[in-house]
């Protein structure tokens, strides 16, 4: 009886660890999608040149600091 309990306990523990890994992977992939979307919004505008460290926001057509723009939202 004790042997079966320990086997079931180990199995459940492994299952929980695997579920945790999967959920972390989904969060990371979701974060990557959001960052990629933000990066696609920050493309250079052909009619506007921005200084080093800045990029053109396609929607507002203004230069914004790249690091600030990615983390403001």
From Swiss-Prot:
Organism: Scolopendra mutilans (Chinese red-headed centipede)
Extent of the signal sequence: 1-25
Entry protein name: Kappa-scoloptoxin SsmTx-I
Domain of life: Eukaryota
Tissue expression per record: Expressed by the venom gland.
Proregion span(s): 26-37
Principal location: secreted
Phosphoprotein in keyword set: no
């Amino acid at each position: 009886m004790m042997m079966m309990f320990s086997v079931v306990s180990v199995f459940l523990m492994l299952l929980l660890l695997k579920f945790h890994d999967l959920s972390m992977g989904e969060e990371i992939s979701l974060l990557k999608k959001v960052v990629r979307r933000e990066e696609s919004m920050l493309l250079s505008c052909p009619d506007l040149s921005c200084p080093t460290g800045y990029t053109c926001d396609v929607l507002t057509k203004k230069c914004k600091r790249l690091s600030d723009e990615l983390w403001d939202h």
